[in-house]
Every structure is written in C-alpha cells, then in structure tokens.
C-alpha cells in the first residue's frame, strides 16, 4: 500500500489540493485530504502552497467536540492542534497551534478560543474563549452596544484582526454559544423566588430582534435568562436574542454607537425609562434641598396632628407627581391645544357630575365625539435600535398608553364626570383601550414582531425548564388572543371614526362594580352607540352587517388579562409599579404638560 507521502504527491500532481490561509500567521498553506481505509478518521497532509514536497504530514482524528480535531502525530516542534472554526470541518478557517515550551510536555493540548483562535483561558458565558473575547462580549451585552459591519458581514475574526469588525465578532460570539444570561447573572445575585419563572420584561434585560434582513444567520433563537422577579406574578424570562426579522421595518445602514452616544440619540427614550424606573425606587435617593425640607416637615409632626403615615403618603404622592410631570415633558410637545379647547368649550354646556347621584346631568348639545377625536397619531421612539430591546418596547407601549389617556381627556363628557369617576373608568378599562390602540397602531408599532418575540420567549423558557406547563399555557393563550383580536381588526379595515366610537363605547361602560353615577355613564355609552350607528349607516350604506361585526369584537377585549398585558409591555420599564397606581397621576397632569401625541405616523 502506498505511503501517506506518495498519496500526497499523487493528489498534488492532480491539483486536487486546497490553498488556505493560516489565520495565526497569515501564511498560505495547502491542505490535502487523503483517504486510507485501514485507518479510522481523517488524514490531513499539509504541504507548501507552491506544490513542493510536503512540509508537514499530520494524521488527525475527529474529537467528539463539534468543530474540533486533535492531532495524533506530532512533528519535531512539539504537539500540534488542528482546529476548524466551522461546524462542517471545512478548511476555510484553519488554525494551527504549536507549543514547544519545555515545561508543557509533549502531550499537552491547548484549547483555542472558538471566536478568534487565540489561546483560550476557559469556558466563559457558555463557550471556550480567550480573555479578550470574554471581555468584549461582556461589554457588548451589558452596555447594549450596537455595531455595524462595513463589509459583507463575513469578516475574518482571528487573533490579530479580531478588533477590526466588532459586528462580526459579536455575531461569532453568539453563533458559537456565548449566552447573555451568564452576563446578566453577574450583574446582581440571583434572587430566590417562590416560583421558578421570572418576568417577561424585567428592567435589567433586553429583547433582541435582528433588524438586518441581509444577515446570513438563520432564525435560531437563543434564550437569555433573567434574575427572578420580586413580584410573585412574574411571568417570563425576557432577555433573549431573537433572529426575527421585523416585517415592514426599513433596513437602514447601522452606525457604530457607544452607550453614551446611543443614549444621546434616543434622548426621550432614555429619559422616559429613567423617570419611570425612578418611581420603583421612591424614597431611596433625595437631593440635599429636598432632605432639608423633609427634615423640617418631620420636625413639625411633633407639633401637628399629622401622622407619620400621612406624611409618608404625601411624600410618595409628591415624588410620583414630579416624576410623571418630568415624564410628560420628556415627550415632544404636540397637539395639546385641541384638548384644551375641548375642555374649555364644554364649560357652560355640561354640569360637572360628582359622586352624588341626585345631581341631574344636563346633556351637552352636539355630538359626543367630534372630528378632533378621530386623529390618533403615535410616533415611535427614534431612532429604532438595531437590536430591539425591552426598554424600546416599554416606551412604545407607554406612549400608546399616554396617547389613549390624552384621547379620553379630550372628550368633554369624560371630563364632566369629575376626577374620581374619570380615574375609576380608566382604571377599569385601560387594558381594553390599550388593546384597541394596539390594533389601531398595528403597523406603526410592529406589534406582530413583538408578539412573535414573546412566543419564542415562552418556547425557550419551557425547553430550559424555567416555567411550568400550566403557566406557559396561560401566557400562550393570552398572546394568541391578543394576536387573533388584532388580526381580526386589521382585516376589517376599520377607519379612525370607527376606532374612536369603539373606544368611547368601551370607555363609558357602566358595568364595573367600582363605578359611581352608572346611569350617567350609561347615557354616554348610549349616545356613543347612536352616533356610531349613524356614522356606519351614512358611510357604509351597502354593508348591512358592518356595525354588528364591529360590536361583536368588543367582548373579546374582556378576555384579555390586564395583569399579563402589564407584565408583557410595561414591567420592564416601570418595575413593580402597577398601571393602576400611575393612572391617577397621569390624569391629574396639567393639560399644558400632558401630551403624548407626537407628530408622526398618522393612523
């Protein structure tokens, strides 16, 4: 039988060898694969790239570890290690390591970094990497850095050139198994919770969705675990990397942004997140002037009838009010004049309704809704990040919530109910109004992608045994109900007037047990229904059953669990603060300061 050297010469003469570049030194070599039926494994014969006599003859066997083979024949320099960075063991990324240090011994085999091929220091974040790639991955995930590739997104990442393209380096880290949950666990200790699951939108986590449609990566999700939520109703692990392409999102040339620059580009986004997050930490940090005022107030307690509990309540209410005043001012000013004019115009024509049901209501002349109530414009935070994170989703949802509150406040009849009744109505039906807003802003918010993210999060959490089957079933049912409702509304091609009347009918629902003046609220609902019927008859005279089809969609709103909606869309932004607790402060804002209608996409 011919020797290995003879087989090598025969193959080289037939020009069947492959010339590759060794990434460590940049030297071109020729690798030839010879088959010997009497020997198990693959045999690699490395020759000079000019086809001369082979400089090295190496017999290699494939190891059980994917993408790695070990040498069985050392050369004069010591033990070599042949390592392929592609799972199919192709020779496109060939790396050789020779160690001839006297203290290592001839049988010492070193692991290489799966990302760049440098000498690995151990397993970091789920993959064998060097210290350099470990630190790079940790910084990228913790700071949520966004990178761009100036090439074709297949840059060579090796020991010498790994810093040239941070985008490809990060993609390579993720592709070879580095997980973000390991990074998150280092940020704070894992808390022991009564349930094994955690929240789907924790404030320290990030939901990543690939935005670049040209990326060669396949849509394989990698789940990222979060620390257990302190709320007992925590639902899902949220931080995850999703290769889901948002439909309808324009692919833009990405810009390399550091964390500081990214925050400056998303000014109102970070401001909103910081202000709302501060509500979860009320009383923890105070400025010096505020401390002095508090001390004087505390001293006065000894000479006053005010109790300490009452003082703490006043202190908390003041913090919440100031935080939400700042939150409202962080949003760009828009069309607040419409709301002011509507409220001013109702004076003299509508009597304020208090909690006393004996007070008669004088019905306002004219329609319940005017043309100014039809416009419902939602502008998403700009710019849209390359990787959609939970704070971006949270602020988008909070803008929709603010916009819905602004819409309700602009209705004179709603204002006529008085502050307490108005707050009770919004507390009771904010989830229904928010869900209708999701359907109306389906394309602007790219709701389909957000829901797909939640579904993949559930699948991965179940596979990793992070929640029970019953809990997963509950969440999946809610998400599918939400998706089904929005899809059905989109198919009906509902216009702005129809959405306005549907929301008015939902808002003035008198069947909640905590409401007062139910008869007055019912009159508003009846008036909204009559106006809705007149509009449908005039606008769609040939569609006899359109009104019935639209009204029959409203019962599905009652099936939406407000707690789960809150967990999915708002928990990552406001922590343990409940939507019910912030609604009064939103509705008590001054009209000049309150405005979440930012000029932008018109629905």
UniProtKB/Swiss-Prot annotation:
The keyword Phosphoprotein applies. The modification Phosphoserine is found at residues 197, 215, 581. Residues 348-590 form the NR LBD domain. Its main location: nucleus. There is a cross-link at residues 250, 588 (Glycyl lysine isopeptide (Lys-Gly) (interchain with G-Cter in SUMO2)). One of its GO terms (molecular function) is protein homodimerization activity. Residues 584-603 are annotated as: Required for interaction with NRIP1. The modification Phosphothreonine is found at residues 220, 222. Residues 1-178 are annotated as: Required for interaction with KAT2B. Homodimer. Heterodimer; binds DNA as a heterodimer with NR2C2 required for chromatin remodeling and for binding to promoter regions such as globin DR1 repeats. Interacts with NRIP1 (via its LXXLL motifs); the interaction provides corepressor activity. Interacts with HDAC3 (via the DNA-binding domain). Interacts with HDAC4 (via the DNA-binding domain). Interacts with PIAS1; the interaction is required for sumoylation of NR2C1. Interacts with UBE2I; the interaction is required for sumoylation of NR2C1. Interacts with KAT2B; the interaction acts as a corepressor of gene expression. This is Nuclear receptor subfamily 2 group C member 1. It comes from Homo sapiens (Human). The lineage of its organism: Eukaryota, Metazoa, Chordata, Craniata, Vertebrata. The gene is NR2C1.
